[in-house]
Amino acid sequence: MFTVAPVHAASGPLGIDHRLPYDNSGIWARHNQLLLEDGVILTELGGALWLGGQNRLGKTFWQSIDSSAFTALTVQGMKYAFGRERPSQTDNPNEWFKGGQSFPSGEVALQASFVTPFIAEYSHNHPWVWALEALPAYDAVARMKTQGHWQTDVLAGWAVGTLWGIYAHDRQTPLILGIMPHGIYVGLHATF
């Protein structure tokens, strides 16, 4: 006699979406996710303003700001366009065009958009910089555990952030730095 264990069916656009058991404790707690988000934004702004755009690291910080800005605009537009409901709102990952804000994950996109210019710039000389991918990886798992996103939401957010990060890195002059009055090529730490 054969017995069949219960199987949790996955669905969604790639057939992998399912709601994870809710876990808002320890490192997965929502307040830790928000601390990471705030820390990344402060690090980007602080590093860019402190270093300016004349040296390699400063330019990379400005590329990261470009990447994050482009990512935020793209993600918000996609959220309005797709209107997918979050796992906390429904157990059906196929609830699209319902006015939700689940697809794609903006926070995972932010993490990917932050780390990608640094990885693109420094990975050839410093392979350890790939460890920065732990930031979007952590945020992806945390967002799913707190039922803020489906699996495809975090993958799409990661992809959007990575693509804008590559684009921003490949630009000779960071866009935001170039459109500011007189640019901010000299950082606050510069000595004259």
Where are these regions (language model features)?
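Hydrophobic alpha-helical bundle signature of multipass membrane enzymes
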Residues: 8-104, 108-144
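Outer-membrane beta-barrel "beta-signal"
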Residues: 181-192
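N-terminal signal peptide c-region/cleavage motif recognized by signal peptidases
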Residues: 4-6
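Transmembrane beta-strand segments that form the barrel wall of outer-membrane beta-barrel proteins
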Residues: 172-181
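Alpha-helical transmembrane segments that form the membrane-embedded catalytic/substrate-binding core
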Residues: 107-111, 149-169
